[in-house]
From Swiss-Prot:
Possesses a transit-like peptide, but it is proposed that this peptide is not removed and that therefore the enzyme stays in the cytoplasm instead of going to the chloroplast. Reversible hydration of carbon dioxide. Its main location: cytoplasm. Keywords: Cytoplasm, Lyase, Zinc. It comes from Flaveria pringlei. Residues 1-108 are annotated as: Chloroplast transit peptide-like. Its EC number is 4.2.1.1. PROSITE patterns: PROK_CO2_ANHYDRASE_1, PROK_CO2_ANHYDRASE_2. It is found in: Cytoplasm. The keyword Zinc applies. This is Carbonic anhydrase. Belongs to the beta-class carbonic anhydrase family. Homohexamer. One of its GO terms (cellular component) is cytoplasm.
Length: 329
């Protein structure tokens, strides 16, 4: 018998929520049975590069009313800009109101302090590391001395590459606590030695070498990868080199949502698919032999989650499994 339970988390307290629908299946002796039934579908990406939406500029800038004789480097001084406008007034007196307004604008810009410095990516990285080192690394020598000897994380986490949903930030993981894999739409493909080796290697390393105790697959609100899955055509040529082929890992989730909620608005379908795709990935994890062994030996557990950064909520559900009884024929 295979069951799954769910509970919602509205920080800071945990609140019981409706359990996920229970289902059962029978299998031969020694075969895992779980509530998630998943298939995989993939399509080879076309070698043709994606075409542009338009082959013309989005807009054309209108010709300026006043075109002073600016220098090419654009580094005119305040005095040079004013002199150019005064010269324009002498030549074209009818432009006096426009020129006067422009002079006022230049004067105001010259007087205002430049409070917004241009973004410096190198400086951002440097300042970020200095802050980390002074506030965390130096103040916690015991932790970092232990990490220098090796890692023994309890969690393996599959999360989306979306910049808004870093699991270490959202779940307050400390260094050494979670082995994290991030990709588009937090997907786990089925076991396959011929492709998706990056994910396969991560699962193998986490389970067999790091001996993680929990594998979490965490989806999130407003996921662009899931919206792509819901809107890309299932068949036909691809418009992307990699994205469409990748998100079809969870095509069974789309099929289920469309079949059960065909008349629902796309945004609501996407929310449903964000969670159902997690279930598909949990099912795909069962195709990895070393994951099944960990489940049989009670050394490993699988859980799914969904982070809603719009409302500040987190849902967590567990995958329970069982071995079927021997059957004589």
């Amino acid at each position: 018998m295979s069951t799954a339970s769910a509970f919602a988390i509205n920080a800071p307290s945990f609140v019981n929520a409706s359990s996920l629908k229970k289902s059962s299946s029978s299998a031969r002796s020694g075969v895992l049975s779980a509530r998630f039934t998943c298939n995989s579908s993939s399509s080879s990406s076309s070698a043709t590069p994606p075409s542009l939406i338009r082959n013309e500029p989005v807009f054309a800038a209108p010709a300026p009313i006043i075109t002073p004789n600016w220098t090419e480097d654009g580094n005119e001084s305040y005095e040079e800009a004013i002199d150019a406008l005064k010269k324009m007034l002498i030549e074209k007196g009818e432009l006096e109101p426009v020129a006067a307004a422009r002079i006022d604008q230049i004067t105001a810009q010259a007087a205002a302090p430049d409070t917004k410095a241009p973004f410096d990516p190198v400086e951002r990285i440097k300042s970020g590391f200095v802050k980390f080192k002074t506030e965390k690394f130096v103040t916690n020598p015991v932790l970092y001395d232990e990490l220098a000897k090796g890692q023994s994380p309890k969690f393996m986490v599959f999360a989306c590459s979306d910049s808004r949903v870093c699991p270490s930030h959202v779940l307050d993981f400390q260094p050494g606590e979670a082995f994290v894999v991030r990709n588009v739409a937090n997907m786990v493909p089925p076991f396959d030695k011929t492709k998706y080796s990056g994910v396969g290697a991560a699962v193998e390393y986490a389970v067999l070498h790091l001996k993680v105790q929990e594998i979490f697959v965490i989806g999130h609100s407003r996921c662009g990868g899931i919206k792509g899955l819901m809107t890309f055509p299932d068949e036909g040529p691809h418009s992307t080199d990699f994205i469409e082929d990748w998100v079809k890992v969870c095509l069974p989730a789309k099929s289920k949502v469309v079949a059960e909620h065909n008349g629902t608005h796309l945004d609501d379908q996407c929310v449903l698919c964000e969670k159902e795709a997690v279930n598909v990935s949990l099912g795909n994890l069962l195709t990895y032999p070393f994951v099944r062994d960990g489940l049989r030996n009670n050394t490993l557990a699988l859980k799914g989650g969904h982070y809603d950064f719009v409302n500040g909520t987190f849902e967590l559900w567990a995958l329970d499994f069982g071995l079927s009884s021997p059957t004589s024929v």
